[in-house]
């Protein structure tokens, strides 16, 4: 290129750079890689077919970027390759929205994955592609795909690279360059550059940062020489690896896929084959039913997967087998080559007959005539204290529908109680002249039901007509939900005390079931009933000292600190059974990462479509770490002016305890105050409340305070945050949504914008919106509608009067404020903020759910859930030994001592405000989670610390709600379940772990190891956490003290990778500090007792 390049050429290169960055952060990193590998232009029609699950706006946004890159490819423009990040930098888990691409971790490259569909004919080779025969026989040593899919991968890449038979226009035109270009097509993932982005969407560059872009302007000959040299090195490496793995790779047959007979495994005797009902395939040739020709293809394509590459020593931080890696590899294998179901034929008549016969047996063995009677004093929403069962004996041609609780029949009906010695009572009635049969419905939740007498026995309905009473029954049923809600809310408010779950019994030595209740709206077990009280509180008072709420002071890790228990708020906003899995706080870290990328794609498509061309720039996506800004020190502050992230690092919750107590006080006692949040409080009293929050280290008592003072103090808290609740980067985006996006599109736009918020901001927003929705529910008393609340709170939440623009100087802002007259832009923003907050209050239940479009997304979103494995699955992780979970535990112990022997080599120190050492280590396998390690010195012997960890968790875990041993496996291994509280109204966190401990270790050390496990006897008591790795190592260090080392890698659900990098390590450090303080306070109390 000549030096006097036109300005249009430079702008085009900038657009290409921004397009590649956008593709990476929105879930299309494979196209950015193809452009950097000089494999553009791509076929836009093929891209549309590949992403046909996306809507039209998202496809248009994607195609705009790809067309830009196609134009740059035609103009022979290049951009600097994506720079590989250092090992210490934060980076997202690589993921693509399309399920037809896979990321190879060994080479850190993307390769196309063409799924082989057995029900459709094989696609013909792409016409016009050069060297097609040679490409068919070529193999790629770096690909994890089977030989069957390699041909499809190469063909698809050729179709993406060019639609004609010639070499792409931006490649070298000489004959010598043909071989390197072909080699780059054969091995799609040949480069070692890592395709990733920063730990959030904010890595998009600003157009003004022209100095950070580098353009390739070298001569034609120099580019050819460099390309040939690079390709020669890759070709040599490819040939060397092909020679070592020649026996494992064969060219695919041109005659199609040939499926052999099942191969008998070693150790499979005749008895085992008989037990598995294995038969010869030849015997089934004449015993099949007639199906369409397209369905006669076998769905059991058995293909051997290529051997996985060996993991490096740094890939697993503790050198233990990873359940996540094994599960992901198996699921990926099945997705690529199909699944072989041994002994199963979906089109076999015998299989259908067996299923029908088994269903018939189940129906015959089901006791259809059994009825359970509910006592009269039964309270809705709770489990009955006593149940008695009887039977229904319809006579004649009557039938009973047990699913709906109704029965039909013209004949006589007899109802009897099995435990009753009285004669059965006959229920007779005449047939209706208008129908051949009549129907009676029985409701067990209707007070004063016509089927019960005052004594509790079934009423005699022999001479009574049923139909006139149906209107009364339906009337009671319609009003039943309202009555239950009022009764439950009243009881919850009365019994919602700070010490509702303070007394937690020590962990029992024998397994017991966790006493959990079933909520009337969500039929899943919960650790709390509808009244907000624990169902497993001890009948006798325990000797555990009472813990009091303490706000957020300077010292935040004392063992007697108590969390706010706001169970009525949690139960009133508990999601229904159908929407539980759709809640954001139930998604894994990998799902959250993918969901964030899709949200950015959706938001980009909507803003580019509806906002003016000069307003939809990514001003909120400025690259991070452009310059190091000194973080202010918040040690002198406790509540007001402290960022939400600092609150999480201090206490584990984004809102201070005193602010949560203020919201609870308003919700329980002040919802009937007219003009709540609208009428102003007294400034002197508000200032006194602020000082009380800042200075109080214990409970902040709001009893007797004016509702308007507390409400004004709450508004000032959000106003004094260092940045708006919607963040500085996204506040303008929220306002643009309600200024330009049509009303019918605003809900999905605002849901996408919420997904881009930091985790702590999103959690606080959800808590606040749910709280405000409860305020509007009492609109008849307080006259505060969503719009009225939005007018009062929008300036505080969006910081409208003090919102700093990126390009606004302090002088301009000061002059703007001195004028005292808002311009039209400010008026529009205030109106948009008011409309937006009112809309979010009204639709708060829909804002924090996974979009429905994700269910249509053809990727591994459901596979990214990464549920814990069962004991049997853990035993199969080590293929070198027989299946036994004990081998897995022993590997974990060996890996722990390997780290100790190597003196924790490779760990990176991390600063923390806690009095403990904190460090982390990156793990390449599994989800994008770091392994954190925290070390502290504890004034106790190793045996005492181990006992406290095993049996006395309630003494140091302030969030503990309940704990039980589910099953004892041996003297040192058990299945343990415990539930931890979360900030209301977010659900509790449920842990089910396999834990084992060792006491006979060298030098008197002890160890405790935990890993999440799936157990059928552990009821779901909240959001099920996946603990990938948790280790406690206790080593004596003399003078009655011990060194406690805690390592943890867990997926708490509902958090982005960025949250784990910034906050989770501080929580690990705070945990060991609380364990140490539990011994320190115990020693202090014992000294005080002796002095007395």
Curated annotation (Swiss-Prot):
- Identify the tissues in which this protein is expressed: Widely expressed with the highest levels in heart, liver and lung.
Residues marked Arginine finger (site): 678
What GO molecular function annotation could you give as one example from this UniProt entry?
lipid binding
Any one GO CC term of the record: membrane
Could you tell me which residues belong to the region Disordered?
Answer: 121-179, 297-330, 409-434, 492-553
Where is the region Focal adhesion-targeting (FAT)? 275-448
Q: Which residues form the START domain?
A: 878-1085
Q: Which positions fall inside the SAM domain?
A: 11-78
Superkingdom classification of source: Eukaryota
List Phosphoserine occurrences by residue. 86, 89, 129, 322
Location in the cell? Cytoplasm; Cell junction, Focal adhesion; Membrane
Q: What is its main location?
A: cytoplasm
Regions of compositional bias (Basic and acidic residues) in chain numbering = 415-426, 514-526
Gene Ontology BP annotations: actin cytoskeleton organization; focal adhesion assembly; forebrain development; heart morphogenesis; hindbrain morphogenesis; negative regulation of cell population proliferation; neural tube closure; signal transduction
Segments carrying the region annotation (Polybasic cluster (PBR)) are: 615-637
Record key words, sorted: Cell junction, Cytoplasm, GTPase activation, Membrane, Phosphoprotein, Tumor suppressor
- Entry membrane topology: Peripheral membrane protein
Q: Where is the composition biased (Polar residues)?
A: 130-143, 500-512, 527-536
Answer whether the UniProt record assigns the keyword Electron transport to this protein. Answer: no
According to its record, what is known about the domains? The SAM domain mediates interaction with EF1A1, and functions as an autoinhibitory regulator of RhoGAP Activity. The polybasic cluster is required for activation and mediates binding to phosphatidylinositol-4,5-bisphosphate (PI(4,5)P(2)) containing membranes.
Q: Function, please?
A: Functions as a GTPase-activating protein for the small GTPases RHOA, RHOB, RHOC and CDC42, terminating their downstream signaling. This induces morphological changes and detachment through cytoskeletal reorganization, playing a critical role in biological processes such as cell migration and proliferation. Also functions in vivo as an activator of the phospholipase PLCD1. Active DLC1 increases cell migration velocity but reduces directionality.
Name of the protein in its database record: Rho GTPase-activating protein 7
